[in-house]
Swiss-Prot record:
One of its GO terms (molecular function) is pantothenate kinase activity. The gene is coaA. HAMAP family: Pantothen_kinase_1. This is Pantothenate kinase. Pfam families: PRK. Pathway: Cofactor biosynthesis; coenzyme A biosynthesis; CoA from (R)-pantothenate: step 1/5. NCBIfam families: panK_bact. Keywords: ATP-binding, Coenzyme A biosynthesis, Cytoplasm, Kinase, Nucleotide-binding, Transferase. It is found in: Cytoplasm.
């Protein structure tokens, strides 16, 4: 008797799709998943949320970010259901009150992750089930410039070692624990440093979005060799914004040009000196910064965390999302 497996031609074996923990979706397939979810933003609101150099319009919001807000709304509801199941199990032994649903948004410098985070904040806050949505960037947990200089880390700014990772993890852990009020330092891109004496206060949001380069980094082992809890261990969902390095470099340089003509003109700007040299000289600096710092960080630290995300959003050369990969449950 011929076995069912041996009777299949070898070519048929080769044609089987490779097993993957992700469900890959085209832009059209993803867009169809929004169903009848209404778009709560208008063109003016989208323009205000758009980052410098980022190309985004109502069609992009409708096709990509509206379905994502619907998915996240379902995840929040499912998490509430799990909490109810746990409370049923615990009975009189104790019960859990609701704690914030935490979303991580990761990706390279200039890839558009800040715009993604702001759009998610705006869209998710329009759902009646979770109107209080807070957004925190990891910039506030960069070490102050004086400390970076003392440690010889100014050329490594943005690398994992340039952050107070323990304080960042503790901040999110406190929010996840349900503390009434948690504070974070404030970072200024104008002065390129932590703002002395300023704090951002987060008060029991329904959803917390944490955006930054290294939010998906695994925890470093302690001096005793024990594995620690990492920031991403507190995430209920995570998004990685992906693109080819050569496209990100082009976006980075375009953004630098626009900043040189706008924000860098401010007398208080840390980068004002690049408005006082020729454009070619300024762009040479930007290219060097990209190739020796930002690209190195992307390839060594940021991109390797892509596989830890629940959703990978892949952009094409025009900043438009082309494909998405959603982790299977």
């Amino acid at each position: 008797m011929i076995s069912p497996v041996s009777s299949i031609p070898r070519s048929a074996h080769r044609s089987r799709p490779e097993a993957t923990p992700y469900l890959d979706l085209t832009r059209a397939e993803w867009s169809a998943l929004r169903e009848k979810t209404p778009l709560p933003l208008n063109a003016e609101e989208v323009e205000k949320l758009r980052g410098l150099g980022d190309v985004i319009d109502l069609d992009e919001v409708r096709d990509i970010y509206l379905p994502l807000s619907r998915l996240l709304n379902l995840y929040v509801g499912a998490t509430d259901g799990l909490r109810g199941a746990l409370n049923t199990f615990l009975g009189e032994q104790g019960s859990q009150s609701g704690t914030p649903f935490v979303i991580g948004v990761a990706g390279s410098v200039a890839v558009g992750k800040s715009t993604v985070a702001r759009l998610l904040q705006a869209l998710l806050s329009r759902w009646p089930e979770h109107p209080r949505v807070e957004l925190v960037t990891t910039d506030g947990f960069l070490l102050p410039t004086k400390e970076l200089e003392a440690r010889g880390l100014m050329s490594r700014k943005g690398f994992p070692e340039s952050y107070d990772r323990r304080a960042l993890t503790r901040f999110v852990a406190d929010i996840k624990a349900g503390k009434d009020e948690v504070t974070a330092p404030v970072y200024s891109h104008l002065i390129y440093d932590i703002v002395p004496g300023q704090k951002l206060t987060v008060r029991r949001p329904d959803i917390l979005i944490v955006e930054g380069l290294n939010v998906l980094q695994p925890a470093l082992p302690g001096k005793d060799g024990r594995t620690r809890v990492g920031l991403a261990d507190y995430f209920d969902f995570s998004v990685y914004v992906d693109a080819r390095p050569e496209d990100i470099e082009r976006w980075y340089l375009n953004r630098f040009r626009k900043l040189r003509a706008t924000a860098f003109q401010n007398p208080s700007s840390y980068f004002r000196r690049y408005t006082q040299v020729s454009e070619d000289e300024a762009l040479d600096y930007a290219r060097t910064t990209w190739r020796t710092i930002n690209k190195v960080n992307l390839l060594e630290n940021v991109a390797p965390t892509r596989g830890r995300a629940a959703l990978v959003v892949r952009k094409g050369p025009d900043h438009k999302v082309q494909r998405l990969s959603l982790r299977k449950l």
